Amino acid sequence: MMSREASIGIDGVYYNPAGVVFLGDGHHLSINWQLAYQDRTIENDYSLFTNNVNNPITPREFKGKAFAPVVPSFQYAYNKGRWSFQGNFALTGGGGKCTFDNGLGSFERIVAETAMAACGLARTVDGALGSVLGREVSMFGSDQAFGAGGKYSYNSYMHGRQYYFGLSLGAAYKVSDNFSVFGGVRGIYATTNYYGYVQDIKVGYMPLYMVLDPTKKDAANIELSCDQNGIGFTPIIGVDFKTGKWNFSAKYEFKTRMRLKNKSVNLVPSIGNLPANLSSQMTQILTAQFTQAGLPAEQAAAKAEAAATAVLANQTVQKTMLGLKNQFDTELDEAIGEYADGKKIAADIPAYLSVGVGYSPIDPLRINVGFHFFDDKNAKAYNNRQEKLDHGTLEYNAGVEYDINKKFTVSAGWQSTNYGLPEEEATTSKDKRFMDDKSFVTSSNSVGLGGVWHFNKKMSFTVAYFHTFYQHKKTTESVELMPGNAINYTADYSRNNNVFAAGIDINF
């Protein structure tokens, strides 16, 4: 049964620890396994994507696949008299592993906008060079170089892994035959890894590395390789009250302060080398042209160097190069700045309140409802991202469990999750935007089915399946490529999730 907040059972070590004390004296153990499979899909619509020579369509779908074949957990309780001593180990957070074989839309957007900016710079440089030489020039804007339309190609990949391992220890005390309390703590070890790249970038027919560092074919590559680790502790308290056919419970987990330390080996292009390499290329090409025109080699080289120097001194060229550098650096920082080596990243786990009510109208039938609140807006995240949420996460659930006979029990349940995501329209400012295609959530509804086979009074075997129906979250951003010329970049986020589970409960 998905709604377990008010249930009395060994899984209450996690859901309702105060209620576990109402189990009989002795040892209680539950060993569980889950298999999870998830698709994450972002559909991006951006007119510049039609400039991708290998896939000139928009909207474009970027799909990630996450598969976790083994997600283990165990719960243990030793009950003696009025006391219950408990322990729990589980993956308490993180999204498992997810791979985007073709990268992300945010990565392609950087390439597409850089291609347009590079073509703009090529036109500016060619114009300035033409003024210096007194004739029309098409050196960088020709079809054999960057071209004029912003055409591009690239290869990209993204893989992420997040695991939050939690070990909880605590004790419950039976104040009376109807009322119990719990106190405990959970230690959490977080480990994550992100690896991705954007490489082999071409603008028109020219590899981008040629104007950054012609001696290094990876000079224009973007590569992210970051490991993160952190430790946190969560105090936990709970209460349970039972009367007649009713049971009431509540649990509160305090906010967990978590700081993830980055250990990264990232590769980023240096746009700062652009002027020197443009000068070198212009000098080489012009020297060859002047030599072919009959100038002695030494005079040709001097004239070519003087022309290149004059072009780079042109204020319009300098302004255009600075604009390209600032645009690229800003977009790169937004994409991977969070993963810079040595940074400590705020990643608090929010305070969590759960409340449950259980009712058993007849002995074989149990009906539960529950409520969860995650105080996300007060859990510090990178760049205070949490402040952009409308509210913390709200969850409502309900479930029913029925004993067919002494051997078999069946159950069904439902849960609704609302993440408090803000609306992101074209006019929404950048500092108010929350969604990020590297790690995102959308509100959802989940349904689950379960069954129990009671071998005997000491042992039971459980199986379950649940599916999550995720909503679509759509965002729109207005992108001004040049003054007075804005186009929209839209994203449609969604997921698809399936989980199978099995476990064994033992009393001894």
Predicted regions: what is each one?
Residues 1-100, 106, 112-114, 118-119:
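N-terminal, post-signal peptide beta-strand-biased segments of exported outer-membrane/organellar beta-barrel
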